[in-house]
Amino acid sequence: MKNDQGFRWSALTFGAAYYPEQWDESLWEEDLRRMQAAGIQVVRVGDFSWSVFEPEEGVFSFRLFDIFMRTAEKTGMKVVFTTPTAAPPAWLTQKYPEVLNHTRTGIPFGHGGRRNYTYNSPRYRELCAIIVERIAQRYGPNPLIIGWQIDNELNCEASEFYSRADEEAFRVFLKRKYKTLNALNDAWGCVCWGQTYSRWEEVELPCITASEAGAGSSAVTGQTSGSSSSLNPHRLLDYYHFVDESCRAFCQMQSDILRRYIRTDAFITTNGTFPHLDNHKMTRNSLDFFSHDTYPGMAFKLDSGKKFPLMDRTWSMYLAQARAVSPHFGISEQQAGASGWNTCMLAPTPKPGQIRLWTMQSVAHGAEFICYFRWRTSCLGTEINWHGILDWDNRDNRRLTEVHETIAQCRLLQEIVGGESLAAVAVAEDYENRFDAETDLLHGMLDDESRQAIFIASQVSHTPADYVWLTDESQPAELFRYRTVFYPHPCIITSKRVEILRCYVEAGGTLVLGAASGCK
């Protein structure tokens, strides 16, 4: 299903992620002027700054960002402001430990990382609503702010949630969906392995199974509860839909607050494609357009055994999937240097020409806002090995020159803004089968192999391909523009989707289905 996109860029726009709270105030004006000299028009700020805005509960401080906004005004720099809810302050998690996510074994996450919270904690939602509203009240009317980003990388790192609040919310979700325990028992096939429930209190979140504990698999981290366990797959599938709904509700809450205070010409977005999240519904209900993070250099990661047969071209697949959510999407984080936390994701610095190549790759797939990550190389914390455009020495360098030249070249491409992809081939996807492939080893293997093979064939034959997400509300006309549609392995398929596919084939389209289609 395609999303209508209300917000449109009038020109290709370039930005950089900037963290004024991490740098001395004396550097700010010079940094913004150097960015502008390179063609950068926008800075993205605010993510992970909750403790700056609210150092103690109910005590708010806007001094740092007030000064920064005055500096931005002085230099003429535009701003994308990010809500800081991805990293709660220490006072919050210490005072209200019920906001913390847990492993499946019941161990609470602690303070010191990020994304350690659960969407379903009433207290966390309450405190998030307060900080988002205070920031929106303060900066929402400011004409320098062209847009707002909600949180940062929803469902990244943690896309499973096991707190008491999550268990209670899961039961509410199931009661709303099934109404009765008999209906749930039938839908989950609970007669298999004697899993029938007689009271709602017996229904729990996905748990550690004997096969997992014996194999010593994911029981320690408590994440990745899919095909590595012997848990009821129908229960897992509903759980993933529950996580999706919880995340989207969290995003919607923030969007509703922002809409009350920000200017009508300012956009709302969020970034990244991460597990157990229906980006189409989230974008349709809460955002003006979807944004993606693109790090093609991770194809060359030094600490990963994963193979990318087409190397950095692999990111064309992810960009095409982002285009399926928003035809004219944004890039919140475009790789500009070597990447790496101190613990993982170590990847080398882009070779000469690769920043230009990767930027053009994003633009070619429909991105109209490109925000490089980051302006300055980090010199503290977990991201200490994550390089930006500038190195630690603060001098002009090869990457800055390449960014400048790339942006100048993109200025010659303005006629493509608002253009439409004209692929003749599409790959059909849906979230039910995406989630199910995590619960079923056979489905997952088939899906991974076929999806990669179709992508490689498309790339080496220079045949552009779109991704089309099907729902029961999709219209057959959405497929008519494609001569061929691949629907790799839709193990789960509804009668309404069968009718959509039948109409497509009867209209002359070629449909390619994979093994196990419709088996569930």
PLM regions: where:
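Aromatic-lined substrate-binding rim segments of carbohydrate-active enzymes
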Residues: 29-38, 42-109, 136, 254-262, ...
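Polysaccharide-binding and catalytic clefts of secreted carbohydrate-active enzymes
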Residues: 105-317
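Short, acidic/polar
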Residues: 22-37, 128-134, 272-283, 351-359, ...
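Conserved, mostly hydrophobic/aromatic
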Residues: 16, 35, 43, 72, ...
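An acidic-aromatic substrate-binding cleft motif
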Residues: 2-27, 32-42
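Carbohydrate-binding surfaces of carbohydrate-active enzymes
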Residues: 200-206, 215-219, 223, 264, ...
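Short, well-ordered coil/turn segments that N-cap beta-strands
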Residues: 9-14, 39-41, 73-79, 141-146, ...
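The substrate-binding groove and active-site-proximal loops of carbohydrate-active enzymes
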Residues: 13-25, 46-65, 110-129, 154-159, ...
